[in-house]
Amino acid sequence: TTNYYELARNSLIKNLELSNDFVILPSGYGTTAAIKHFQELLGLYIPPATKKRFSFKIDKKTAPLVIVGPYEHHSNEVSFREALCEVQRINLDKQGLVDLNHLKEVLEKNKHREIIASFTIASNVTGIITPYEEISKILRSYSAIVCFDAAASSPYMNIPTHLYDAMFMSPHKLLGGPASCGLLIIRKSLVDTSIAPTFAGGGTVLYVNKTSQTYQNDIETRETAGTPPILQFIRASLAYQLR
């Protein structure tokens, strides 16, 4: 079983043309779970009940700024509104596309802040392709973390890894993909292995005694708590192989 699971991972790396700087993390059932996993890794996600219990207040001046596009799926915008960050939506231009001038204005105004940008590659509604190469180039010039929602685009195209730092995918949108798992593609340098994993479950630990624990250093291992989605991950791999 482990062998088939790792073969699936290697197949995904090949078919998605991923560099050695990235890892693939199976996440829930689709892009929504992949975005949540990303937010957890970057310290942005916080459960609403925790907010209520401890009365969290965000200082807009010091919180990360998350920039999103004008036609994002709810998961790629509303979820960030509830996270520990400030959200800025980029306007549409006169042609109904991403207003790149507005993007530059927002970046210049906030260049002193930590900036995370998350744009869809293709609209779930219209299929319009976002100018992701130009957007990435602009964001890189401001040292922003670049994220792409590839839910609607990955059945048809790959995105070169130098253009992004994290990508969210829903293999269930591919032929043969239903019942697969969501995928988070993330640059290894964004994952802090000096702290506990996002969930300290079975399989994430290296050693445990009565009072302390040491966690695995391998990112894929420490970020797949409990029983891994073996069949779902293999199905995702086969779907991209068929593509």
What are these regions (language model features)?
Residues 1-243:
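Pyridoxal 5′-phosphate
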